[in-house]
A protein has these predicted regions:
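Hydrophobic transmembrane helix bundles of membrane-integrated enzymes that assemble
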Residues: 1-116, 164-220
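Long extracytoplasmic/lumenal interhelical loops at the membrane interface
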Residues: 110-113, 119-180
Length: 220
């Protein structure tokens, strides 16, 4: 599947191009978040009904792996919250697949991007990634008191390639605060919490286990 989305030129021919060939045709973390919440929902559903085959966990992990590093990191939360012993063979098979790719194909541009934290860990650099380092060093800052209260009313800058987001930040929290202040950010959290709770009420008898774990995943 190709993509009809118009994206910045830097994504075409880059190591992130593999993420364009998905149903959502997106090269950004939203694709990881979609598959992550799908995995979380299926694990929660299976915890209640115990009807889904364990091999589905392996396939979901493989699908999520090609969507981005957000899935790779946060899927651990879902697995720990809804762990079943019968998932162990699928988890071991997935771990072996990841280690084999990271060990034998670290120079492959797609593997290098998707499994960067694992590759760094195998080479003694710790479980880190360039995107996390960039976020911590270049995109996080403390807004002024005025920005917290009144905000700047800006979300995008109008640039097409670099610096598209106001404040040149890649942090979702800061983007909301700069746009509408801390009150607006709290409203966004409240709306997210409302929909997560509605899903829990409709599917999982209002399970706070699902509500809190899903909200933690979405908050990150």
């Amino acid at each position: 599947l190709s993509t009809n989305a118009v994206l910045p030129a830097r994504f075409y021919g880059s190591e992130q191009e593999y993420r364009l060939y998905n149903i959502t045709a997106t090269a950004f973390f939203q694709l990881s978040l979609f598959y992550l919440m799908l995995l979380h929902f299926l694990l929660a559903y299976n915890a209640k009904h115990n009807t889904l085959p364990s091999i589905l966990v392996f396939f979901m992990l493989c699908i999520g792996l090609i969507s981005g590093r957000t899935f790779l990191l946060l899927s651990v939360v879902s697995i720990l919250v809804y762990f079943k012993w019968r998932y162990v063979p699928s988890l071991i098979a997935f771990a072996i697949l990841v280690l084999l790719l990271a060990y034998f194909l670290p120079e492959n541009p797609y593997v290098a991007h998707a499994l960067e934290p694992v590759i760094n860990l195998l080479h003694g650099a710790g479980f880190v990634s360039s995107s996390t380092d960039t976020l911590m060093k270049n995109h996080l800052f403390m807004p002024t008191l005025k920005q917290f209260i009144y905000a700047d009313g800006m979300y995008m800058t109008g640039q097409l390639e670099v610096g598209r987001y106001y404040g040149h930040t890649d942090s979702g929290f800061l983007r909301q605060i700069l746009y509408g202040g801390v009150s607006y950010a709290l409203v966004c959290f409240a709306v997210t919490f409302y929909f997560v709770r509605k899903v829990a009420l409709n599917w999982f008898d209002g399970s706070w286990k699902f509500i809190l774990s899903a909200f933690v995943i979405l908050a990150f």
